[in-house]
């Protein structure tokens, strides 16, 4: 907001406490004209076509998928989804791939000993390229991220190096 990257935002949470804290931060930073908050289960309080981008972050992958599924019409009216599941990341990647989205950008950070992947998805009318890939390649892309792999993401490398290996 303060970098003028987006003109307006809507912060949504299902719980009052986090929303009240968000409102405190919004007021403290003088952003009440730019950011509104809504108490809502997922995307229920967002109207079709109301937003260009949807960010779903900081929750498990199953919940991310539930929110995307329940709010499918709102998601379809947005230009992009930015997702940061805390678990079951491969299931979220598989879900977006199988529901007509393409992951166009990804990043991964390491913070306090934890790895956090995030990815940007856009609607894709033709995801048939995946049909021509063998099952192992698709599984690896779902597990580790097609863009992270393609770009040789250094944090992904750290993540992979830490995996246990068999010693003889």
Where are these regions (language model features)?
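S-adenosyl-L-methionine
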Residues: 12, 16-52
């Amino acid at each position: 907001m303060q970098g003028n990257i987006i003109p307006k935002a809507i912060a949504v949470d299902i719980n009052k406490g986090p929303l009240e804290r968000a409102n405190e931060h919004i007021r403290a930073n003088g952003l009440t004209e730019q950011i509104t908050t809504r108490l809502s289960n997922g995307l229920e309080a967002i109207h079709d076509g109301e937003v260009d981008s949807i960010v779903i972050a900081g929750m498990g992958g199953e919940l991310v998928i539930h929110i995307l599924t329940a709010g499918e019409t709102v998601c379809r009216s947005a230009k992009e989804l930015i997702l940061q599941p805390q678990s079951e990341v491969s299931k979220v990647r598989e879900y977006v791939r199988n529901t007509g989205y393409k992951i166009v950008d990804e990043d991964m950070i390491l913070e306090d000993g934890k790895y956090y992947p995030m990815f940007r998805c856009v609607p894709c009318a033709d995801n048939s390229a995946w049909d021509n890939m063998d099952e192992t390649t698709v599984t690896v892309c779902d597990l580790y991220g097609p863009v992270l792999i393609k770009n040789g993401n250094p944090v992904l490398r750290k993540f992979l190096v830490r995996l246990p290996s068999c010693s003889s």
